[in-house]
Swiss-Prot record:
GO terms for biological process: mitochondrial electron transport, NADH to ubiquinone; reactive oxygen species metabolic process. It catalyses: a ubiquinone + NADH + 5 H(+)(in) = a ubiquinol + NAD(+) + 4 H(+)(out). Gene3D superfamilies: NADH:ubiquinone oxidoreductase, 30kDa subunit. This is NADH dehydrogenase [ubiquinone] iron-sulfur protein 3, mitochondrial. Residues 1-33 form a transit peptide. Its main location: mitochondrion. Upon mitochondrial dysfunction, the translation of the mRNA occurring on the mitochondrial surface is impaired and amino acids non-coded by the RNA template are added to the C-terminal of the protein. The C-terminal extended proteins aggregates in the cytosol and are toxic. The phenomenon is called mitochondrial-stress induced translational termination impairment and protein carboxyl terminal extension (MISTERMINATE). The gene is ND-30. It is found in: Mitochondrion. GO terms for molecular function: NADH dehydrogenase (ubiquinone) activity. The keyword Electron transport applies. Its EC number is 7.1.1.2. The keyword Metal-binding does not apply. InterPro entries: NADH_DH_suC, NADH_quin_OxRdtase_su_C/D-like, NADH_UbQ_OxRdtase_30kDa_su, NADH_UbQ_OxRdtase_CS. It comes from Drosophila melanogaster (Fruit fly).
Length: 265
């Protein structure tokens, strides 16, 4: 009797071990299907290319809309450029109020004036564009404020809001001839004493009007009218190898932020 029990137990153990190594038909079919299914290639990550963040775009749009609602007298347009860069276009008389609002408002705190740039577009009625680049360290955010003027209309100086605007506005006055009212020390900063004209204007010749040289006889630097060794040539021509032909007479594409937020579905 004991031998019979041992024999039955051995057979049951052998059957259990063999059952573990048997792959059912359904499992083999699934294995074959999984091995033949095409695998989608992974997208290459380019660390040098910054992809726009949808959440950041939404927050910037909401903030630009909020600024336009708070300052409807000065804000003329709000737009997003390069995917997620906020620009606020304002009237010339709104430079100081808008910059003061962006600096002092608790939800903005754009206390750092990074730079002020000038742009000359002669085909416009107001040919000069002045761009204020602001940084908020509190919220790790940037914003651009743009305004416009012409050769005769001055802009209010931003020195009373940002002390860093002093030299930036002097540079724009020197290069473009944009006058800033109430500036504490508006004089040239890059060109030489007695320089005439503004070099960054589009109608200023590349060769200039005068030249400075050291005179061995007079033992000093003299300023004389420019003498060209060849006939003056005009280089303002379109070329087939120009890298950015679309931006010659057009602005970069921008996405306008509507005054009202889109309804949520």
């Amino acid at each position: 009797m004991a031998a019979l029990i041992r024999n039955l137990g051995a057979r049951a153990a052998v059957a259990a071990l063999s059952a573990k190594h048997v792959v059912p038909a359904a499992g083999s079919t699934a294995l074959r299907m999984a091995s033949t299914t095409p695998v989608e290639p992974k997208k290459a990550d380019k660390p040098t290319v910054r992809q726009p963040d949808a959440v950041a775009r939404s927050h910037l749009s909401d903030f630009g809309r909020y600024v336009a609602e708070c300052l409807p007298k000065y804000v003329q347009k709000v737009q997003l450029t390069a995917g997620d860069e906020l620009e606020v276009l304002i009237a010339p008389e709104g430079v100081v109020p808008v910059l003061q609002f962006l600096k002092d408002h608790h939800q903005a705190q754009f206390t750092n004036l990074v730079d002020i740039a000038g742009v000359d577009v002669p085909c416009r009625k107001n040919r000069f564009e002045v761009v204020y680049n602001l940084l908020s360290l509190r919220y790790n955010s940037r914003i651009r404020v743009k305004t416009y003027t012409d050769e005769l209309t001055p802009l209010d100086s931003a020195c009373e809001v940002h002390k860093a605007a002093n030299w930036y506005e002097r540079e724009i006055w020197d290069m473009y001839g944009v006058f800033f009212a109430n500036h504490p020390d508006l004089r040239r900063i890059l060109t030489d004493y007695g320089f005439e004209g503004h070099p960054q204007r589009r109608d200023f010749p590349l060769s200039g009007y005068v030249e400075l040289r050291y005179d061995d006889e007079k033992k000093r630097v003299v300023c004389e009218p420019l003498e060209l060794a060849q006939e003056f040539r005009k280089f303002d021509l379109s070329a087939p190898w120009e890298q950015f032909p679309n931006f010659r007479n057009a602005n970069p594409p921008a996405e306008v932020v509507p005054p009202q937020a889109p309804a949520k579905k």
